[in-house]
A protein has these predicted regions:
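Polytopic membrane enzymes that build or remodel cell-surface glycoconjugates and lipids
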Residues: 2-165
Length: 165
């Protein structure tokens, strides 16, 4: 006969809960995330003085008729028409929204790209916060590295590269 294992009479090991960022507990991480986002915004602020480039911006923005019509037919066209042999309907939709707000004012397109990059950086912070069991320093460090990494510069400062954001 097989021997039965003796059950340990000690305390059961506690279940480790993954921290969750909630609206009621935002003060704890905002003091880590806000400086990261502010620094990234300041780094990209000079971009607002840039204009459109002679590369793809002419085809994606300045000469793109899809941006001018946000009617139902215009939306159908955005979601069914490739631009420069690429199919990026959400990018074209965001450029069309930009066009509706400020037509061909380059700084508004750059500002939108910066804000999209800041949102992505905040999402990286949140993701790492979840993975690191709530370590705010690690989350802030990784988010800062993501936000200022040279690999992302082209996506933020070149309007037609918004598709990479």
């Amino acid at each position: 006969m097989a021997e039965q294992r003796k059950k340990s009479k000690g305390k059961p090991s506690p279940i480790k809960k993954t921290p969750v960022i909630t609206s009621s507990g935002t003060k704890g991480y905002i003091k880590y995330l806000a400086p990261v986002l502010a620094l990234i915004f300041l780094i990209f602020l000079p971009v607002l003085r840039n204009g459109f480039t002679n590369w793809d911006d002419i085809l994606y923005v300045t000469n793109n008729l899809l941006l001018k019509d946000l009617s139902l037919n215009g939306l159908k066209a955005i979601f069914s028409t490739p631009v420069v042999s690429n199919y990026h309907p959400l990018t074209i939709l965001s450029l069309a929204l930009n066009y509706q707000m400020a037509e061909l004012t380059p700084w508004s397109y750059h500002l939108t790209s910066i804000f999209l990059h800041l949102i992505n950086t905040a999402l990286v912070f949140w993701f790492i916060f979840q993975l690191s069991s709530g370590n705010k320093w690690v989350s802030a460090s990784v988010a800062l590295l993501f936000g200022i990494h040279p690999m992302h510069v082209e996506s933020v400062v070149w309007i037609s590269e918004r598709k990479d954001l």
